Amino acid sequence: MKMIVGLGNIGKEYDKTRHNTGFMVVDELAKKHDINNFKVQSDALIADFRVNGEKVLLVKPTTYMNDSGRAVRPLMDYYDVDLNDMIVAYDDMDMPVGKIRLRQKGSAGGHNGIKSIIAHVGTQSFNRVRVGIDHPTKESVVDYVLGKFRKEQITDFEIGVQNAVAALEDWTTIENFSQLMNKYN
């Protein structure tokens, strides 16, 4: 089984905000595969589907961003998901809007959702797909990540989400993560 985790904050007030990029990636993947049967389990909304016979679990933690690991670890244990079979989609302020980058491991880079997952799984060695949201120029980081994309950013962001979805679909069938990184980075 593969597990795709999208990071975000629950609540209507966070819909379409930059920090909900991971949720938007998972939602777009679900939409593409006609998945609308999310249910609540272990502080998360989950749904599953199959790709080439492989079961894939979509996960959207219902904890706030900073406590995402509390939802992820129990699901990994319950479904017996190996770290190599999990990937996390999330926003990255250090990349231009819509740019994606895949990584196999690394620090949290200041992202509190990733920091929480690292703390709960006990390692930095897990797959990630980051989608660029750019860095604030005038506003505070908190106001920026909890804000919505500017009109001129929307097209680039939507392209980034589509590229992240394509990378996640490929990830479900490609065993060599380095090949995937070469294709998308």
Curated annotation (Swiss-Prot):
Name of the featured protein: Peptidyl-tRNA hydrolase
Organism whose genome encodes this protein: Pediococcus pentosaceus (strain ATCC 25745 / CCUG 21536 / LMG 10740 / 183-1w)
InterPro entries: Pept_tRNA_hydro, Pept_tRNA_hydro_CS, Pept_tRNA_hydro_sf
Sites annotated Discriminates between blocked and unblocked aminoacyl-tRNA: N9
Cellular compartments annotated: Cytoplasm
Gene3D superfamilies in UniProt: Peptidyl-tRNA hydrolase (3.40.50.1470)
Key words of the record: Cytoplasm, Hydrolase, RNA-binding, tRNA-binding
Catalytic residues as annotated in Swiss-Prot or TrEMBL: H19
Native organism taxonomy: Bacteria, Bacillati, Bacillota, Bacilli, Lactobacillales
Annotated GO MF terms: peptidyl-tRNA hydrolase activity; tRNA binding
Domain of life assignment: Bacteria
CDD domains assigned: PTH (cd00462)
Reactions accelerated catalytically: an N-acyl-L-alpha-aminoacyl-tRNA + H2O = an N-acyl-L-amino acid + a tRNA + H(+)
BP GO annotations: protein quality control for misfolded or incompletely synthesized proteins; rescue of stalled ribosome
Family: Belongs to the PTH family.
Cellular component terms (Gene Ontology): cytoplasm
Record site: Stabilizes the basic form of H active site to accept a proton: D91
Subunit and interaction comment: Monomer.
HAMAP family reported in the protein's UniProt record: Pept_tRNA_hydro_bact
Function: Hydrolyzes ribosome-free peptidyl-tRNAs (with 1 or more amino acids incorporated), which drop off the ribosome during protein synthesis, or as a result of ribosome stalling. Catalyzes the release of premature peptidyl moieties from peptidyl-tRNA molecules trapped in stalled 50S ribosomal subunits, and thus maintains levels of free tRNAs and 50S ribosomes.
